[in-house]
Swiss-Prot record:
<dbReference type="GO" id="GO:0005730">
    <property type="term" value="C:nucleolus"/>
</dbReference>
<feature type="compositionally biased region" description="Gly residues">
    <location>
        <begin position="61"/>
        <end position="71"/>
    </location>
</feature>
<feature type="compositionally biased region" description="Acidic residues">
    <location>
        <begin position="160"/>
        <end position="208"/>
    </location>
</feature>
<dbReference type="InterPro" id="IPR010678">
    <property type="entry name" value="UTP25"/>
</dbReference>
<protein>
    <recommendedName>
        <fullName>U3 small nucleolar RNA-associated protein 25</fullName>
    </recommendedName>
</protein>
<feature type="compositionally biased region" description="Gly residues">
    <location>
        <begin position="10"/>
        <end position="35"/>
    </location>
</feature>
<comment type="subunit">
    <text>Component of the ribosomal small subunit (SSU) processome composed of at least 40 protein subunits and snoRNA U3.</text>
</comment>
<keyword id="KW-0690">Ribosome biogenesis</keyword>
<dbReference type="InterPro" id="IPR053939">
    <property type="entry name" value="UTP25_C"/>
</dbReference>
<feature type="compositionally biased region" description="Basic and acidic residues">
    <location>
        <begin position="36"/>
        <end position="53"/>
    </location>
</feature>
<keyword id="KW-0687">Ribonucleoprotein</keyword>
<feature type="compositionally biased region" description="Basic and acidic residues">
    <location>
        <begin position="146"/>
        <end position="159"/>
    </location>
</feature>
<feature type="region of interest" description="Disordered">
    <location>
        <begin position="1"/>
        <end position="214"/>
    </location>
</feature>
<dbReference type="InterPro" id="IPR053940">
    <property type="entry name" value="UTP25_NTPase-like"/>
</dbReference>
<comment type="similarity">
    <text>Belongs to the UTP25 family.</text>
</comment>
<dbReference type="GO" id="GO:0000462">
    <property type="term" value="P:maturation of SSU-rRNA from tricistronic rRNA transcript (SSU-rRNA, 5.8S rRNA, LSU-rRNA)"/>
</dbReference>
<comment type="function">
    <text>DEAD-box RNA helicase-like protein required for pre-18S rRNA processing, specifically at sites A0, A1, and A2.</text>
</comment>
Length: 742
């Protein structure tokens, strides 16, 4: 029985790479250059979150091997009690003897994935590569130096000014930053009349842009802002098709304010700039996903959409880009037209802008996701010219095929192309041109990964170097593929939201006579629209919306009624769900571990010989370390041999653990969610799976086996995706604590 799954609720933190400020950097070859420049030059470790000991990605050593966080990589764990250990023989000999008993067909998949991991390491463009050991880094540097010497005659003549570049340390530390920008700041309102996107647009008082940003009713928004500040929200649950909508509006006592926006079925129902309406003329009717997100999106209300799929991803990008462009074009046209009015009469008081120019921020997981968003922008905007497009293609587009078709669709969608998560890109618009790599303060839209933007802002340890003024006037935040961001360093996302819409520390050429009053009153965060697209809901996303979404227009959470993936499994297998009690969220980890050691482990010990083929899947790295140490040090489980694969495991370590597990040398295999998310190993030899925490989805293939899942009442979000919304509610509240599915 092989195990395949998909990462569900995130077990915390994430991995980061250091750069400027106080981050610990580490040089490394990245296939033709790595991040440097104003991010601090070297790629290293970023700050980890408290959920998971600052851990980061982990797609094997080929994608790096450390978790985000300060401090060195943990020392290698002497992992397993090996059955039938031959003290006179080397470990390599033992491996050879065991593997000789396994058919080539059985380990073929393992070898293919190992080769794939090695190829990914050589490609130099990892998704969140785990930091390599210092030894491997040294070898990499040596190879690079040897290669340089071989080039000899092709090498450019060196001048005295180049002496520093010969230093071996600088050879890895000094890298080209493909995202670096060197251009001066422009005045936010500096634009000629010919840059108008539409010259003859008439103002429409019913346009949501007018009612929310340009000319909102002061009495209305002030009353709502007071309610938001007092945390007074009214929640209405609305059923719409297959979605559940939890609609929150500031409680002001006015019942008319609690209605959902009118449905939108096509482009004709939107208040678009003429240029955008013409480019969208062929896309007249919206599909189901577009109809679901459009009413809240185009009415400037916050939204957490928890039903993003690979199939609906293009539709969601289209709506997000159309809305972002519509907002940018209307904002810029208003500024340019008012420039003309002020040239005729400088006594006019026209307030039409914020402190800085950037108005839209898009947080995305990888460079490839940025490519997809940019391509959709170009499709919708139809620019006549694209400045620096070649540079963008060279730095972001990767057309190589890295994965075979047997990888899951969502995995290929996320990690195909350039899966580098260290990027930031400014984009500036004029009537005819899109300019890539514009300076942040000259940009209209900023595309960035959480890590890339965090590095651009700087480190808290050196506050003088912090620069987040370019986020002071962001009016629209779009977070796409938030479920993938959860597997990175979620603390970076929280850090960014904490620095949105703060009062700028420098003027940056701002004409304060044209700044909208609510900016001056420090109320910008109550006008900002935040839109989050995710495959599912998690406590982290719900908390992000609760803490950082203060939109006076209201906010909503949309997610489907789940039928449960358990009924769609390709094989019939016995699945047992065991509930344990936890007094609070803080007490949940201890209660979970206690239940595991008292109720699960004794069964493995009593039947140690029959325990072969037991895979223990552990979402949280902290829990993984706890369980691993228990198996290694507790005499009660001395008879159970085990191996482990975590996000730290390099390719040889993971291969060895899988081989020992397949041959039965390791009866138990500990496997972390993050390792599975980034590698998607097909583990062979699995006879039973134990989940220490309920997961988002589960797929078993090629054979029969049993599954046991531990859960508490705090796992309801994950549990409902597995067993279904209705069943999950009963399983949490019913008196019994064991539930069997066949």
């Amino acid at each position: 029985m092989a195990f395949r799954g998909r990462g569900g609720d995130r077990g915390g933190g994430g991995r980061g790479r250091g750069g400027g400020g106080g981050f610990r950097g580490r040089g490394g070859s990245r296939g033709g250059g790595s991040r440097g420049g104003d991010r601090g030059g070297s790629r290293g470790r970023g700050r980890g979150g408290d959920r998971g000991a600052s851990r980061g990605r982990g797609r094997g050593s080929s994608r790096g091997g450390a978790r985000g966080g300060f401090g060195p990589r943990p020392s290698k764990f002497n992992d397993a009690r090996l059955a039938d250990k031959d003290e006179d023989g080397s470990e390599e000999d033992d491996i050879s003897e065991d593997e000789s008993n396994v058919s080539e067909e059985e380990i073929e998949g393992s070898e293919e994935e190992d080769e794939e991991g090695e190829e990914e390491a050589q490609s130099g463009q990892p998704y969140m590569s785990l930091l390599k050991s210092f030894q491997s880094a040294t070898k990499s540097k040596k190879r690079k130096l040897d290669h340089t010497e071989e080039e000899g005659p092709n090498k450019a003549t060196k001048t005295e000014d180049d002496d520093d570049s010969d230093d071996e340390d600088d050879d890895e530390e000094v890298k080209e930053d493909v995202d670096a920008v060197d251009e001066p700041e422009e005045d936010p309102q500096d634009a000629p009349l010919e840059d108008l996107f539409d010259e003859d647009d008439d103002l429409d008082d019913s346009d949501p842009f007018e009612t929310h940003f340009a000319a909102p009713d002061e009495a209305t928004f002030q009353a709502r802002i007071k309610a938001v500040q007092a945390n007074k929200w009214r929640t209405d649950r609305i059923a719409q098709n297959s979605n559940r909508i939890y609609y929150n509006t500031p409680e002001t006592g006015d019942s008319t304010e609690r209605k959902l926006p009118h449905s939108i079925s096509g482009v004709a129902d939107l208040k678009l700039k003429k240029k955008l309406a013409e480019s969208m003329a062929k896309h007249t009717e919206f599909d189901e996903a577009e109809k679901a997100v459009a009413p809240l999106l185009f009415n400037y209300q916050d939204m957490l959409y928890c039903n993003r799929t690979v199939a609906s991803s293009e539709s969601i990008r289209r709506m997000a880009c159309l809305h972002a462009l519509n907002h940018v074009f209307k904002t810029r046209d208003r500024v340019i037209k008012n420039n003309t009015k002020l040239q005729r009469d400088d006594t006019l008081e026209l307030r039409d802008q914020g402190f800085t120019r950037p108005k839209v921020l898009m947080l995305l997981p990888t460079r490839q996701s940025c490519v997809k968003m940019v391509e959709m922008i170009c499709e919708v905007a139809s620019p006549e010219q694209q400045e620096h497009r070649k540079r963008f293609d060279e730095g972001y587009v990767d057309k190589s095929t890295k994965f075979s078709d047997d990888k899951p669709e969502d995995f290929r969608d996320l990690f195909s192309g350039s899966d580098d998560d260290m990027f930031r890109l400014g984009m500036k618009f004029t009537r005819k041109t899109i300019k890539y790599f514009s300076q942040f303060y000259n940009s209209d839209i900023i595309f960035a990964s959480p890590l890339g933007l965090r590095m651009a802002i700087g480190s808290e340890e050196e506050k003088k170097k912090l620069d987040y003024d370019f986020l002071s006037s962001i009016e629209l935040v779009i977070v796409d593929q938030a479920d993938a961001l959860l597997m990175q360093n979620w603390e970076h996302v929280e850090f960014i939201f904490e620095h949105l819409n703060l009062q700028p520390r420098d003027a940056h050429g701002c004409d304060f006579s044209r700044v909208r009053p609510w900016y001056l009153d420090d109320q910008a965060k109550y006008f900002r629209q935040t839109v989050i697209f995710s495959a599912f809901n998690t406590p982290e996303l719900a908390e992000l919306q609760r803490l950082h979404c203060h939109n006076w227009a209201g906010k909503a959470r949309l997610h489907p009624e789940y039928p449960g993936v358990i009924q769609y499994l390709g094989v019939k297998t016995r699945q047992t769900f065991s509930r344990f009690d936890a007094g609070s969220i803080a007490a949940d980890p201890d209660a979970r571990f206690a239940y595991f050691t008292k109720a699960i482990v004794p069964t493995l010990v009593k039947r140690a010989k029959d325990a072969a083929g037991t895979l223990i899947f552990i979402p949280s790295y902290l829990d993984f370390v706890r369980v691993r140490n228990y198996f290694a040090n507790n005499p009660d489980v001395a008879s159970v041999t085990f191996g482990n694969i975590s996000e730290y495991a390099d390719t040889p370590e993971a291969s060895r653990a899988r081989s020992h597990f397949l041959t039965g040398r390791h009866r138990v295999l500990l496997y972390t969610e993050r390792a599975h998310h980034f590698r998607r190993y097909a583990i062979k030899g699995v006879k039973r799976v134990i989940f220490t925490k309920s997961e988002q989805s589960l797929m078993l293939e090629h054979g029969l086996g049993t599954v046991k899942v531990m859960f508490s009442k705090y796992d309801i979000m994950k549990l409902e995706r597995i067993v279904g919304t209705k069943r999950a509610g009963k399983m949490i509240t019913e008196q019994g604590d064991t539930f069997d599915f066949v």
